């Protein structure tokens, strides 16, 4: 996970290549900067936005983006596990799943892009935490069940979200190996995001 290693997912600099931009944001449910977020999304202009910790107020604020992102799927909750996908492209067979717990939703859908269809999973499993879950058992179960399912999917598949894990953990290693997915961070960097108030070296 440093630039010294060969990249696992190559970059495409060819102008004829179709480039898609996916932005994932754990917005922090108590964050009140909803309209600043909307403004930032308009500026960044990703093709897809996956939002985590979405409650009803955040979901309502995102209606301002509907003209640009007419296709959505999600479930807003007030327990820090609401999830929402906004897309410029049509979504098909969209489902909200509860792989391990009824109050921990994930997204499973197909995205149609210029006649081609890819599979998308948006996830936010519960982390091990003294205040939430004393062990990583539920998180690990969700990720490994998903990996087992993905390995049999023939379509191009994307998994995005907040996995509440570090890339060097045994669970992360097994998830990548079992699913057959590639990690775009390999050869580029850790891109650690927590805590965003700290310098990168301390995350």
Q: Model-found features: residue ranges?
A:
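Structured beta-strand-rich core segments of catalytic domains in phosphoester-bond hydrolases
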Residues: 2-12, 29, 33, 48-127
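Canonical alpha-helical transmembrane segment with a positive-inside/aromatic-interface signature
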Residues: 4-24, 33-42
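Structural detector for hydrophobic anchor residues on beta-strands
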Residues: 20-23, 82-84, 107, 155
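Active-site beta-strand/loop signature of hydrolases that rely on acidic residues for catalysis
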Residues: 22-27, 37-61, 120-123, 142-175
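Acidic/histidine-rich helix-loop elements
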Residues: 24-30, 126-137, 197
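Glycine-rich, phosphate-binding/catalytic loops in enzymes
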Residues: 39-41, 65-68, 103, 137, ...
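Residue-level detector of structured alpha->beta connecting loops
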Residues: 45, 88-90, 154, 180
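Active site of divalent-metal-dependent phosphoester/diester hydrolases
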Residues: 70-85, 103, 165-203
